Amino acid sequence: TVHAADAEQTNPLQFYTGSNNSFAKATLQVEVGLFDQGNSWFGNAREALGEDSDSWWESIIRPGLEGSYFLPNTQEIYGQVDAVQANTGGGLDAAASNADLGDVSDLRIENAYAGWRSGNLFSSLGENFLDISFGRQQYKVGDGFLLYSYAGSGGDRGAYWIGGRRAAEYAGIVRMKTGGLNVDLVYLENDPISNDSTELGGATVNYTFNDNASIGGGLYTLDSDIDSRDGMNVFDIRGGVKPFALANGPEALRPLRIDAEYVHEDRDDGFDAGNGWHITTSYQFEQVAWQPTLTYRYASFDENYDTLFYGFADWGSWYQGEIIGEYVLGNSNLDSHMVKLKVQPFEPVAVSLFYYNFTIHDAGDFGVKDDAYADELDLVIDWSVNDHLSLSLVGALAMPDDGATEHTGGDDDWSYVMLYGSIKF
């Protein structure tokens, strides 16, 4: 969503600046990913995918326009439109999304929405108490555990990993904010690659007590061409707290943070209910060089859980593992442990090391005898070169257990390297 504060006077693509902070600007983002792997699908890619997957590249080019115009009482009309040219080439991606397609190139509209903010019109309720928007746009809740990305990527749309398609086919959103309380009313329709669309309507509530505690939830109902989704009601509750900071506890324990989310999916017509949840603890060593942050997360999704519209908000959330979570297993019928260590050796560079352990929640339902699936190690180096250019280097190694060998037919360690770059104006 466009904010006037995002319009910097130095933006080389800004072509209009009004006296009241109104603006209009062109936007441009270019993303490129280079991928190489060894022993993909644990050495059995040809049987699992129909052909080998060794290396490939992806790119997207996203030109667009953004604007904001201020009215009396600091009311604001804003909007955005952009298109995405997505490409995959050089080989079969690790998900085989371009199987039988070869090199893929696809151009289509991504975002196209407009909105209005109330400014000081309801001054007693706070600045921008009301925000109404409609059109092709992305609706994000929390860290993307449930609602984040609504359009399919890969296949004949190209760029499977970069994922240039995230906006809903249509979304109408009413946001209300006063003090620490945020209430959203939302209706949207997703934009899948298949013709099986899903409509979602409901409400999201979040209350932030202060920097140390928040709680939120949502209630949504679905109308879908997919039988197991049609008529489903979704209940979501989530929260985060720094318990020792909130209680003015010992100084050394104040950086400790606990986050959790639980989703229950209630179905009719003989379909079983689904449940997914996680609990995450993290601690930042604020007085130590490089300010390391150590995180542990346990996540569990039963065999009836529908991942709906989860997405990538950060490394590991909610694609769990740069091999397993990206290409092999989604967030259903899966239990996982994650340990993450993140350090910042100097300001523009962050280094993250991940360990994952994956087990199948119900091995029989998955079609294997052993629920132990795989372990994975990931190394991610992020470099913010400047305000416009960022680079990431990813190295990953997935080591199969008996469940993965039974599932894929392979028993070799799967290695993976990716170089990603983004230029954004």
How would you label these PLM feature ranges?
Residues 114, 201-203, 235, 417:
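Well-ordered beta-strand positions enriched in small/hydrophobic/aromatic, beta-favoring residues
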Residues 35-39, 46-51, 92-105, 121-229, ...:
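Surface-exposed coil loops of outer-membrane beta-barrel proteins
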